[in-house]
Amino acid sequence: MTVLTQPPEHFVFMKVGNHARENFDSILERKLKEYETTGKIFWGYGGVTCHPIHQVQPFARQFEKKGSLYLIMQYIDSNADPDLVPATQYSIDGITWHPIPRGITVTGSRYAMILSEIKPGDLIIYPSEYEVAVGRRRGRSADEYLRGHVDKGCFAKKLPSRAKKDKANQIKTSYQAEIVEPYSVFVR
């Protein structure tokens, strides 16, 4: 995987941190072992944004011909404490279910992003230069979309005539990973 030194034209953004009584460093260490063992990572997440079928998979298909799709992660101090039961199955379509591959653990999540290796990589993202690329909020400026409790989204660069670099509203990110097929799945 190539570590990005400039923000990409399109990406999935996610705030990440401690989860299910596990600190973020432990999660990263576990996920790197998953990658070494299986060649992929199931990065669990929940919430109402970045639904596998309605947002992530269509977004990935829309941009796959333009190059790799990345998950860009911003570390935050999180106290997410969901159910600790590990998922045992995943589904691409929400209908047909398969066992989670041996060596992969997804805890306290409804969905999982399918990733290659997670790499450190500092980027500065200006959300005002991007817009929501799929779903009901398509076309909405990413800076407006991320206000409040929204912690993830599928974003694409705005047309130059609509983009403005708002230096007061920047996001510093610390980690990145390439999103690989099937991009995002349901887990249970």
Where are these regions (language model features)?
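Contiguous surface segments at macromolecular interaction interfaces
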Residues: 1-22, 26, 92-188
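Residue-identity detector for glutamine
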Residues: 6, 55-57, 62, 74, ...
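Acidic, glycine-rich low-complexity segments with interspersed aromatic residues
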Residues: 17-77
